[in-house]
Amino acid sequence: MPPGDRRDRPATNPPHGKGLSAMALSELSDVLWTERRLLELLLFKLEEEQLVLTSGRTRWLAHATREVETVLDQIRDAELGRSVEADAVALELGLEPGQSLQALAAHAPAPWDDLLQAHRDAFVQLTTEIAQLADGNRELLAMSHRATQETLMSLQESVQTYDPQGHTTAAADRSAQLLDRSF
C-alpha cells in the first residue's frame, strides 16, 4: 500500500456506533470545498467572458474561452476525486457506491449531515448561476454572429470586382459576391 493510503489511517468511531471514519468524511469535505472553489472560479471566468462579449473587445474572446475550458478541465478532475471519496463514504455508511450528495447527507452523522447538505445547496446555487450565465453568453455570441452576417450581406451590394480587361464591374453585376463561408 502506498504511504498515505486511506487504509493506513486509523478510523475514528463516531458517537452513533456505525464505525464511520471521520477521516473519510473530512476528505470528502475537502474535495467538495475544492470543487466549490472551482465552480466559483468558473462563474468568474464566465462573467469575464461576458464582459469581453458585451464590450466588443472580441480580440480577447479566445483567451477568455480558453480560461473557461481550463477551469472546466480542473472541475472534471475534481469530480473524479469527489466520486472516489463519496463512494468511500457511501460504503462506510452501508450504502451502495454512486449515491448522491443528498443521500450521503441524509445518512451521515451530525455535524457532517449539515455540512454535506450545505455543500449540496451551494452546488445547486452555483450550477444554476453557471447555467444562466453560459446561456447568456451563448445568446450574446449568436447575436454577434447574426450582426456580423448582416454586415457582410450589406457589403455584398457594394462589392466591385475586376473583369478580364482589368476594369471594375458595376455593383449591379451580381456575378461576384463577397461571402465568408466560415460563418
Annotate each language-model stretch with its function.
Residues 2, 100-183:
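Short terminal interaction segments
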Residues 5-8, 13:
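Intrinsic-disorder-associated, low-complexity terminal segments enriched in Asp/Asn/His/Tyr and depleted
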Residues 12, 17, 136-137:
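Generic cytosolic/nucleocytoplasmic N-terminal low-complexity/intrinsically disordered segments
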Residues 11, 68-70, 156:
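Hydrophobic alpha-helical segments
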Residues 7-8, 28-32, 178:
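Short helix-onset patch at the extreme N-terminus, typifying the N->h transition
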Residues 2, 15-104:
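Extended, charge-rich alpha-helical scaffolding segments
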